[in-house]
Amino acid sequence: MLIIELLKAIFFGIIEGITEWLPVSSTGHLILVQEFIRLNQDKAFIEMFNIVIQLGAIIAVMLIYFERLNPFQPGKTAREVQLTWQLWLKVVIACIPSILIAVPLDNWFEAHFYFMVPIAIALIVYGIAFIWIEKRNAQQEPAVTELVRMSYKTAFFIGCFQVLSIVPGTSRSGATILGAIILGTSRTVAADFTFFLAIPTMFGYSGLKAVKFFLDGHHLDFAQVLILLVASLTAFVVSLLAIRFLTDYVKKHDFTIFGKYRIVLGSLLLIYSFFKFVF
């Protein structure tokens, strides 16, 4: 029944809206949830669905940060306009590693890593990394506490960390936040740049997935269009709340709790995978 499929779409949209911005892996969570709750659709649609519903999350970022990211915003001084263009240049530079590395390798990683065990391992490894980096940061102050002070070189290397998210379970936001902190930025700067970098990255990735879906000879029926729209709209609404939560959270707390969550979830997935294999 279509109503059941739409309820599932709402559920998946909630998962996407929460996990896209928290450093816990949205794709990993969607793959995990779909182990137990699946859309009654073909494999090609589900693979495309898992990526394209990110568009709702991206639009949420654009809405929240529209004035800050718009160089043509009325009332901005010449200096503010210049800084906005410089921010966009940093974002473009940070996209280069993904264009050169992640895009060509995407299909290979999708074929070999989109199942439970690699997701579990990635969750645990990056969970440990978050705990380690926060312990290190407790003993030193960040070198970059404002986004305008971030260098183009730092932006490029943050983009290199983003490439790591090609492995499901890594988390795009997790990889970029972790990389930014390792490179000396504050948590606030790391989170902000992660949000901004998501706009071209996720638009591009979602667009490529959609184009590939149609070039492979697939098409969307009315029910599938409705499922995509409902899931994307849900992801948009939930993302508005998740982004507000994370921006407020990082002002007073570190990412240790997310590291612990990743380790616990990854461990449970490994146990589940073991029993599923044995029995």
From Swiss-Prot:
Main localization is: membrane
UniProt-listed Enzyme Commission number(s) = 3.6.1.27
Membrane disposition: Multi-pass membrane protein
Reaction(s) catalysed by this chain's protein: di-trans,octa-cis-undecaprenyl diphosphate + H2O = di-trans,octa-cis-undecaprenyl phosphate + phosphate + H(+)
Q: Which GO terms describe its molecular function?
A: undecaprenyl-diphosphatase activity
Q: Which domain of life is it from?
A: Bacteria
Q: What is its EC class?
A: hydrolase
Pfam families annotated for this entry?
BacA
Disulfide pairings: none
Record key words, sorted: Antibiotic resistance, Cell membrane, Cell shape, Cell wall biogenesis/degradation, Hydrolase, Membrane, Peptidoglycan synthesis, Transmembrane, Transmembrane helix
The record's subcellular locations are: Cell membrane
The record ties this protein, via InterPro entries, to: UppP
Transmembrane residues, as ranges? 2-22, 44-64, 85-105, 113-133, 163-183, 188-208, 223-243, 255-275
The Gene Ontology biological process annotation of the record reads: cell wall organization; peptidoglycan biosynthetic process; regulation of cell shape; response to antibiotic
* One Gene Ontology CC term in the entry: plasma membrane
Summarizing the function annotation, the protein's role is: Catalyzes the dephosphorylation of undecaprenyl diphosphate (UPP). Confers resistance to bacitracin.
Q: Which family does it belong to?
A: Belongs to the UppP family.
Q: What else is known?
A: Bacitracin is thought to be involved in the inhibition of peptidoglycan synthesis by sequestering undecaprenyl diphosphate, thereby reducing the pool of lipid carrier available.
What is the designated name of this protein?
Answer: Undecaprenyl-diphosphatase
